[in-house]
Amino acid sequence: MGSAGALLSHSPPGLGGFPPRHHHHHRLSVLRCVPLLPSPAPEPLSCRHGRHLRCAAVDGGAGRETERPSPPAPQREESPSGSLGAALEDPSPQPVQNGSFGGITEDEEQSSLYNFLYPSKELLPDDKEMSIFDHLEELRDRIFVSVLAVGAAILGCFAYSKDLIRILEAPVSVQGVRFLQLSPGEFFFTTLKVSGYCGLLLGSPVILYEIIAFVLPGLTRDERKFLGPIVLGSSVLFYLGIFFSYTVLAPAALNFFVNYADGAVESLWSIDQYFEFVLVLLFSTGLSFQVPVIQLLLGQVGLVSSDQMLSIWRYVVVGAVVAAAVLTPSTDPLTQMLLAGPLLGLYLGGAWMVKLTGR
């Protein structure tokens, strides 16, 4: 019927039994169907969704509506373009349980700590994968190299142990302090102790290099870029702490003890206890100077922000005094204050550096 109507509406005047009329405009319009579905062949139109098919024919401006039940929906056939079938089909979404995909919640995906512990594959460098046995073998080799380097440094320091002892005695030697050997072999074991500390200090760069070389393949590209400043800053701060302890902290503490005993007793110190005091003070000060490095690591992971670090400055003051009392082997308040001051300054400097990084 649709084809016949179309032929009648487009036929020339005088054909099909309809004489030409110039004053009355009566024509049979094209059959309109709602909804209109394209069909490659003149087949009966049908709607897939809905119960009825409503058609309307207009003749001379007067509309007649016919209603007939729609036949059962046929199976969908692919049209030449394939767009109609794809538009009618609604893809079924994948079920989401508790707002998570694969057991990972959105909060975990947005957490900087989670991203630090479990980086995505795109951030990982293209390194060679190794089995657990290969890792253990590599760890064994690097430990062997570190022990060999420290052992060689200890032997070298032992060869010049007397010169090292004279250098460490310099802070109090000008004040007339005399060192005694109170037991047989005390000086020998003291030289071994001094050589061990100095050898560990000289071999620490090799140990640090081996640690970095072992953990570097497991780091992402961004973490590798961040590793260089951290290692360099940690090394500089460690040696700066040792230098500060040798030039400022140790002389101040030793002079306090000498002046306090002046006029009452003669200063005759055990060489073993003296070097125990000095070496522990040097290394504890170097370790305490690592506070800014720890702050940068915590800031990069996202655990603590710079504003949070600055908001607890009152507790930091108390903590610096307590840490100075624990780290210094002496019990005098002067040494504790001399160490607590730099610790507080390092903490504030570390918070400022974290703020510069945008954390």
UniProtKB/Swiss-Prot annotation:
Gene name in the database record: TATC
Tissue expr: Expressed in leaves and shoots.
Transit peptide: 1-54
Species of provenance: Oryza sativa subsp. japonica
Similarity comment: Belongs to the TatC family.
Subunit structure: In thylakoid membranes, TATC and TATB form a large receptor complex, containing about eight TATC-TATB pairs, which binds the precursor protein. Twin arginine signal peptide promotes pH-triggered docking of TATA oligomers to TATC-TATB receptor complex, inducing a conformational switch of TATA that results in activation of the translocase. TATA dissociates from TATC-TATB upon completion of translocation.
Reported phenotype of the disruption mutant: Pale green phenotype. Mutant plants have low levels of chlorophyll, show quick water loss and fail to accumulate ABA under drought.
Protein name from the UniProt record: Sec-independent protein translocase protein TATC, chloroplastic
GO MF, any single term: proton motive force dependent protein transmembrane transporter activity
GO biological process: intracellular protein transmembrane transport; protein transport by the Tat complex
Topological region Stromal: 55-142, 220-225, 298-308, 355-359
